[in-house]
Structure formats: C-alpha cells, structure tokens
Amino acid sequence: MGQYNFDQILDRTHTKSLKYDFAVKRGKPADVLPFWVADMDFEIPPELKQILLDRVNHGVFGYTESDDEYFEVLQNWFSTRFNWTPDRKWLVKTPGIVFALAMAVRAFTNEGEGVLINQPVYYPFSMVIDDNDRRLINVPLIKGEEMYTIDFEGIERAIVEENVTLFLLCNPHNPVGHVWTEDELKRLGDICIKHNVLIVSDEIHADFVWKGHTHKVFADLGESYAEHCIVCTAPSKTFNIAGLQVSNIFIPNDSLRRRFIKEIDRAGYSQLNTMGIVGCEGAYKVGGPWLDELKEYIQDNIQFTIDYVAKYMPKIHVYRPEGTYLMWLDCSKLPLTPKERDEWIINEAKLWLDTGSMFGVDGEDFERINVACPRKVLEEGLEAWRRAYETKGF
C-alpha cells in the first residue's frame, strides 16, 4: 500500500465537470458512465491541494505573474525527468496547448498553406487547421498488429507536393499510444529541416510513458532540431489540473519565439490566471512522489483492461499503449458499422467513450477509452460493456 489512495471514488457530478455534468447537453443519455475526455478521476496531490488552499485563503486575486522560482521548478522537473535543461528565455506561457497550436498555425503559415498531421490524431489538431483556413494535409500512420509506425516517405512526398510549411506532431501519440523513438524523431526532423518545415511537438502526455519506453523531448535531439521546433508542455494531464488553464511552451529559436509572442499579443492574450501559476509551480515542486505512485496504478489498470477485453470481448483488439493513460481499441471485427457501434456502446453498454472517427477517418473502426480512474470504476465500465457484448451474441 502506497502513500496515496487511488482507489478512492470521488463524486464529480454537480461540480460543472465537463466529463460528468454535460452528457445530455452533448447528446448523450444522462446515465452514461464517462470514459471519454482525457482528465483523470483522481484527486490532485494533497500537497498541491494545500498549496492551492493556502493561496485561496490569502483572499486577494489581483494580477499575478510567474517569477524566477516558477521557471526554476520547471527546469528542475525537465532536467530530472527527461535529462533536458531548457533555457529560461525559451519559455512562453499560454492558457493551453490547443491555444498554442492555433497561435503557431497563425504565426507561421498563411491561409491556403498546408499543415501536416498524422491521423488518427488528437482532434483539435484538425480543428486549428480548418478553423484558420489552412489546408489539412493528412499522412496517416501505418497501422500494425501491435502498434502504429510513421510513413516517412509519405510525409516527405506530401511536404513537397502540398506546400507544407508546418507539421503538428503528437508525442506521446494520442490516441494510438506510441512513444516515438529518438531515431524516429530525428528522421522526422531531418525531413522537416531539409524542406524548411517547422515542427510543433505536443508533448502534454510526456509524464505518462510506460516501462520499456523513454520520452525524448524534440528540442533535445540537437541544436539544429531545436532551432526548427516548438515544444508544447503542460502540467494539466500529469497532475489533473486542466481546469487551471496553464501551459508552458518552449521555443529555442529567437526569431520564431518573437513571431509566436507577437501572434499571442495580436489575439489580446496577456497573462495566466493566478491559480494556474500557483498550481503549475506547486505541482512540479511537490507532485513527483504522487505521480510515481499514480503511474504504477495506471499501468495496472492498463494491464487489467488488456486482460479483461481479451478474455470477455475477444473480437475487440486492444493496443497496448507505450504512453498516455488512453487506450485505443480496434473494433473492426464487430459486425457493426461505426454508427451502429457507437449507438450500441452509448445506449446499451451505457458508456461514453471517444469514438474513433473523431480522430480522423483512419480511426473509424476504433474507440478510445480513458483508464485513469479507480479500479472499481474501470471494472464497472468494462463489465457493462461485457454484458452488452454478450447480449449481442458476439
């Protein structure tokens, strides 16, 4: 038994929780069990909770800014956890990574230019491209039996043929769970440098990389790679504080950083909220032991899910994630269309998952499930799915 209790089940309803309180408004039955959005059902580290409470008890919430300690805590985290020591001048703070992606698209591309992604991929990647009137250039990942790989030749061909100027990379990859190796990242980087394509690397899930795999920060590949990239990080997934709206973006190239900041200024954004600053600094300062225990718990949940689905729902294939607490389930052997499958899961299993089509056409045969929850909640969800599976006679 560890220091922290991850078996505790918290009632998150009536807290204005996006995950729990908005099913009906999003067209779902009121009684679905949510395993969709990527936030966890665990209370934040108690040490961090106390830091936030102390700040609330102060009672004044005027304009707040980060100081030297904020950056030093960040730097220590990345140095200790990833053997990467960023320079302070590289840091640009934003209220979220999706906001940062949108700012990058606007700062470094023109309307009509191509922005490259690898679907299936986190759906806001597509949104920030489409909403800013850029051309979405998709080079799908190559689906393997146990994991996906990158179509390097397809990427280079698309860059040349489609006038691509920006590449949005997801590492660790959401939803397929692949942690790109150093060799893969360098090969991607070499292609992009050759054709003067800027890489924006979303590394929000970097703290959830599982045994046998290592996360490599893109900017740590070497100086030439660092000069051609933007690295997006945040404490939100790691410590379950997405609602505090804080991200840390690292841009080693001075010219790129100035252009990025100018685009943020044009959008009218100026500074983080008070609790975001306090929460981010506090999380990276005191949250390490909590995270280490949490990762063990989630890895057990991942193994439980793999074993359970293989035993009771064998027509569904689970991809073992190398990173993230999200699992990618191949439902292509079920005799259902994607629409029929989604309706079956929602209305009969009473589960709210992220349907694979949200991640692009290449995800239509899949469902994504979030297993960052107490074991009993996970068991309840999988048992409900099993009953619906058996009722269908699969």
PLM regions with names:
Residues 4, 27-33, 38-53, 85-87, ...:
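PLP-dependent class I/II
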Residues 9, 61-63, 218:
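Short clusters of hydrophobic/aromatic residues that line enzyme substrate/ligand-binding pockets
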Residues 57-60, 104:
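Short acidic, glycine/Ser/Thr-rich loop/turn "cap" segments at secondary-structure junctions
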Residues 55, 62-95:
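Conserved N-terminal alpha-helix of the aminotransferase class I/II PLP-enzyme fold
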Residues 16-23, 140-143:
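Short regulatory "switch" loops immediately downstream of catalytic or recognition motifs
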Residues 1-19, 28-31:
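Conserved PLP-binding active-site segment in aminotransferase class I/II-type PLP enzymes
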